[in-house]
């Protein structure tokens, strides 16, 4: 008998702005999607196409997030674990086993779970979750770029690139910026001195 297995992965731990996203995906036993691998190894166009196919074919899937305020109050690791738990809790079908990318398991899942280092390249359910989390994170950055085009979020996706750091200095810190991340925190501290 097929065991209902969910894969869980996150996207957006490193950027200076926005939420950290997590996805949980249960795939059918017969699922086959050529080219599905760790989302970081895929082009954006390929990720977007795969995301639609995953959503259409999955037994269940759910994407969840933890916002900048939660990241600031909990720290990025605990906020990531919270987003992962929300993703699992949001599944319409309860899995019998969960595989989580990385080396940590969120608390209180109440389902047998296993952390798998580099799982997004080893386990297809985690690869699928990786794609859904990354496309959701990118969508947040495109929406933010619409509201604040001068920051270039559509290009750097919120990471601490030269363009982003220059925009931070020139235009200031947005409510969506992660105030506990060093480049943002340091800029706010400098501004407080003047």
From Swiss-Prot:
Protein name per its UniProtKB record: Ribonuclease HII
Membership in a protein family: Belongs to the RNase HII family.
Statement: the UniProt record of this protein carries the keyword Cytoplasm: yes
Main location per the UniProt record: cytoplasm
Subcellular location, record wording: Cytoplasm
Domain RNase H type-2 residue range list: 3-193
Family matches, as Pfam families: RNase_HII
Binding of a divalent metal cation, residues: 9-10, 101
Entry EC number(s): 3.1.26.4
Cofactor dependence: Mn(2+); Mg(2+)
CC cofactor note: Manganese or magnesium. Binds 1 divalent metal ion per monomer in the absence of substrate. May bind a second metal ion after substrate binding.
The reaction(s) this protein catalyses: Endonucleolytic cleavage to 5'-phosphomonoester
Gene Ontology molecular functions: manganese ion binding; RNA binding; RNA-DNA hybrid ribonuclease activity
GO CC aspect terms: cytoplasm; ribonuclease H2 complex
Top-tier EC class: hydrolase
Record-linked NCBIfam families: PRK00015.1-3, PRK00015.1-4
Function: Endonuclease that specifically degrades the RNA of RNA-DNA hybrids.
Biological process annotations from GO: DNA replication, removal of RNA primer; mismatch repair
UniProt keywords, alphabetically: Cytoplasm, Endonuclease, Hydrolase, Manganese, Metal-binding, Nuclease
């Amino acid at each position: 008998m097929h065991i209902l297995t969910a894969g869980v992965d996150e996207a957006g731990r490193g950027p200076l702005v926005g939420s950290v996203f997590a996805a949980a995906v249960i795939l059918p036993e017969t699922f086959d999607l050529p080219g599905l691998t760790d989302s970081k190894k895929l082009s954006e166009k390929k990720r977007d196409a795969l995301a639609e196919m995953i959503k259409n074919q999955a037994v269940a899937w759910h994407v969840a997030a933890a916002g900048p305020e939660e990241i600031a109050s909990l720290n990025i690791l605990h906020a990531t674990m919270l987003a992962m738990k929300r993703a699992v809790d949001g599944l319409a079908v309860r899995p019998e086993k969960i595989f989580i990318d990385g080396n940590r398991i969120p608390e209180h899942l109440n389902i047998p779970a296993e952390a798998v280092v580099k799982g997004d390249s080893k386990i297809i359910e985690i690869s699928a979750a990786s794609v859904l989390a990354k496309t959701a994170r990118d969508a947040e950055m495109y929406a933010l770029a619409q509201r604040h085009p001068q920051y270039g979020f559509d290009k750097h996706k919120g990471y601490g690139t030269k363009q982003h750091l220059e925009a931070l200095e020139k235009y200031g810190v947005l409510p969506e910026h992660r105030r506990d991340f060093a480049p943002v925190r340091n800029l706010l501290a400098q501004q407080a001195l003047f």
